[in-house]
């Protein structure tokens, strides 16, 4: 789930879960 994680990271740039 690396791609999903990377995609989520960019999608959650404003509400990141501590993974900037």
From Swiss-Prot:
What is the protein named?
Answer: Elongation factor Tu
Record keywords: Cytoplasm, Elongation factor, GTP-binding, Nucleotide-binding, Protein biosynthesis
Q: Name one GO cellular component term.
A: cytoplasm
**Assembly and interactions?**
Monomer.
What is the source species? Mycoplasmopsis synoviae (Mycoplasma synoviae)
* Organismal lineage: Bacteria, Bacillati, Mycoplasmatota, Mycoplasmoidales, Metamycoplasmataceae
Task: Note the superkingdom of the native organism.
Answer: Bacteria
Homology family? Belongs to the GTP-binding elongation factor family. EF-Tu/EF-1A subfamily.
Q: Name one GO molecular function term.
A: GTP binding
Instruction: Outline what the protein does.
Output: This protein promotes the GTP-dependent binding of aminoacyl-tRNA to the A-site of ribosomes during protein biosynthesis.
Keyword Nucleotide-binding recorded: yes
Instruction: Answer yes or no on keyword rRNA-binding.
Output: no
Name of the gene encoding the protein in the UniProt record: tuf
Predominant place of localization: cytoplasm
Subcellular localization is given as: Cytoplasm
């Amino acid at each position: 789930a690396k791609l999903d994680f990377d995609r989520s990271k960019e999608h959650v740039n404003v509400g990141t879960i501590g993974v900037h």
